[in-house]
């Protein structure tokens, strides 16, 4: 290995210990580099070939990689260089790569990291069903995945995920507008027992049929986001109240067919709902009107 650079400004003092003289495996990697932000590590590797080797060894041992730590945008060549030796990743987040990330960029990374448990691909619209198939097939421990705003996710892609990911707990399908009730019903029947968090927000194709099937098959469901699901109504919410004792939060803003009586049972259980009761809404409106604020008590 290339020796470290000499100190600038003169020779090293006798007995002095340089950073790279410390044990790499036992000291520098676990106790120093693990605490240095990724962006700073990329700068550090420019100091010398020895530092570059140290940083590459650290990158190869990464358990968590979030491209946002590098910056709001990351070039394809940089991503390839950063992840070329990584074989132990458990968490992978690639949202900053959404403009250019293709199947051929992602699939090799997935193949080298079968231990992945969390993958965030929000907004990665250039991917296809092939990438999701590789993820489902090669990462059996997958627990969390975000596919928000991935328009290419269709019913067939979701079926593959449901069939091959037995540990799935959290799934973000926000704005995956190709998905319809049938696909969500299949997901509920295959993986509902373990699901804890699900977002179906901004999908006008999802209705009460899907919500009711989720309720009946997801006893551990804690968080459900139905924001903007225009076909969801009170029947679906009532079924949630009946079959989901673990539910902690429900998002139904812009679900215009969901009436307050169906939500009241959940409110009494302490479920966090993003729509205020009608009385509270009326009082807030009154407060906004000139002359009423001194007389309105929101605690009524």
Curated annotation (Swiss-Prot):
Gene Ontology biological-process entries: bone mineralization; dorsal/ventral pattern formation; G2/M transition of mitotic cell cycle; positive regulation of BMP signaling pathway; protein ubiquitination; SCF-dependent proteasomal ubiquitin-dependent protein catabolic process
Chief location: cytoplasm
Domain F-box, first and last residues per copy: 19-66
InterPro entries: F-box-like_dom_sf (IPR036047), F-box_dom (IPR001810), Leu-rich_rpt (IPR001611), Leu-rich_rpt_Cys-con_subtyp (IPR006553), LRR_dom_sf (IPR032675), LRR_FXL15/At3g58940/PEG3-like (IPR055411)
Positions carrying N-acetylmethionine: 1
Keywords (A to Z) from UniProt: Acetylation, Cytoplasm, Leucine-rich repeat, Repeat, Ubl conjugation pathway
Pathway entry: Protein modification; protein ubiquitination
First and last residues of every LRR repeat: 141-162, 167-188, 194-215, 220-241, 246-267
Annotated compartments: Cytoplasm
Cleavable signal peptide: none
Domain of life assignment: Eukaryota
A GO cellular component entry from the record: cytoplasm
UniProt-annotated stretches for the region Interaction with SMURF1: 113-269
UniProt record similarity statement: Belongs to the FBXL15 family.
PANTHER family the UniProt entry points to: F-BOX_LRR-REPEAT PROTEIN 15, PARTNER OF PAIRED, ISOFORM B-RELATED
Assembly and binders: Part of the SCF (SKP1-CUL1-F-box) E3 ubiquitin-protein ligase complex SCF(FBXL15) composed of CUL1, SKP1, RBX1 and FBXL15.
Function comment: Substrate recognition component of a SCF (SKP1-CUL1-F-box protein) E3 ubiquitin-protein ligase complex which mediates the ubiquitination and subsequent proteasomal degradation of SMURF1, thereby acting as a positive regulator of the BMP signaling pathway. Required for dorsal/ventral pattern formation. Also mediates ubiquitination of SMURF2 and WWP2. Required for bone mass maintenance.
Protein known as: F-box/LRR-repeat protein 15
Lineage: Eukaryota, Metazoa, Chordata, Craniata, Vertebrata
């Amino acid at each position: 290995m290339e020796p470290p650079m000499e100190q600038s400004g003169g020779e090293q003092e006798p007995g002095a210990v340089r950073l790279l003289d410390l044990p790499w495996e036992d000291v520098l990697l676990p106790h120093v580099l693990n605490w240095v932000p990724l962006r700073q590590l990329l700068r550090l590797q420019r100091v010398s070939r020895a530092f570059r080797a140290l940083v590459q060894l650290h990158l190869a041992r990464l358990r968590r990689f979030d491209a946002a730590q590098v910056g709001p945008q990351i070039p394809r060549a940089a991503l390839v260089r950063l992840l070329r030796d990584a074989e132990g990743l458990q968490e992978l987040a690639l949202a900053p790569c959404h403009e250019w990330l293709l199947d051929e960029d992602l699939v090799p990374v997935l193949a080298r990291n079968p231990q992945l448990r969390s993958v965030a691909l929000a907004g990665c619209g250039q991917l296809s069903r092939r990438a999701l198939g590789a993820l489902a097939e090669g990462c059996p421990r997958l627990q969390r995945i975000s596919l928000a705003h991935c328009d290419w996710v269709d019913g067939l892609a979701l079926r593959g995920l449901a069939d091959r990911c037995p540990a799935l707990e959290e799934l973000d399908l926000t704005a995956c507008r190709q998905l319809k009730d049938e696909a969500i019903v299949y997901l509920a029947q295959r993986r509902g027992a373990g699901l804890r968090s699900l977002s179906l927000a901004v999908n006008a194709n999802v209705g009460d049929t899907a919500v009711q099937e989720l309720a009946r098959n997801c006893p551990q469901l804690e968080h459900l986001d139905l924001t903007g699901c225009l076909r969801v109504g009170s029947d679906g919410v009532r079924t949630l109240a009946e079959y989901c004792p673990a539910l902690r939060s429900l998002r139904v803003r812009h679900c215009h067919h969901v009436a307050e009586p169906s939500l009241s049972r959940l409110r009494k259980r302490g479920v966090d709902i993003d729509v205020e009761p009608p009385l509270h809404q009326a009082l807030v409106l009154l407060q906004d009107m000139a002359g009423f604020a001194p007389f309105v008590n929101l605690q009524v």
